[in-house]
Amino acid sequence: MIENIKKRRKKIKKLLKRKRRQKRINYINNLSITKFMSQIDDKLFLKIFKDNRRGYFKSFMKLMSRLGDGYVWAFLYFSLYMFRIKYAILYFARAAAAVFICIFVFLYIKSFFSRMRPYKKHDKIPIMYPPDKHSFPSGHTMVGFAISFSVGSYSFGSAILFYTIASLIAFSRVYVGLHYPLDVICGIVLGSVIGMLTNMAFYYMIGLPIVGHI
């Protein structure tokens, strides 16, 4: 009897939570500025994305989008270690800290805004692989630019390498139809800010330079 009451209470709490969340989403979506930005964002997205594209560039963009899952960053870290770059482990630790912060931040923001993916609005967009539900902001882009700011600050050469890859991943997320341009732009800003703050934190904690190397 008591267990049934507890189960009912849990169900009621979940239902109320869903209703509050839906009410918040509806409020945000009905704001004039939100509607205006969504219209511009949607038009820009449709110009970038075209479902009839074929060829090597589209295949390359698909590859870059998948590399954003973490494979390319792991390879680059391994390369840093193999080339015996001084304090590679510290730079790895700093980047890892930035990544964990990014994951926490973008999961919270995605849950708060609950913006639909482009494929849910446009029927002609094929799903390349099952992504998570929400679009805003782009988690891949956030992580890419946080890592680039963290590790790319080691030298000018590493900055060019990391930022080039991060930019390609960011563009590919729109090109293959997984994100709107605004998702990616906000991901760039948030990722860069998190990367900068992480660099500053490691500087004050252990003296690892914000820009450059020891």
PLM-predicted stretches and their roles:
Residues D123-I214:
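Membrane-embedded catalytic cores of phosphoryl/pyrophosphoryl-handling enzymes
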Residues I2, K6-D132, M142-I169:
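Hydrophobic alpha-helical bundle signature of multipass membrane enzymes
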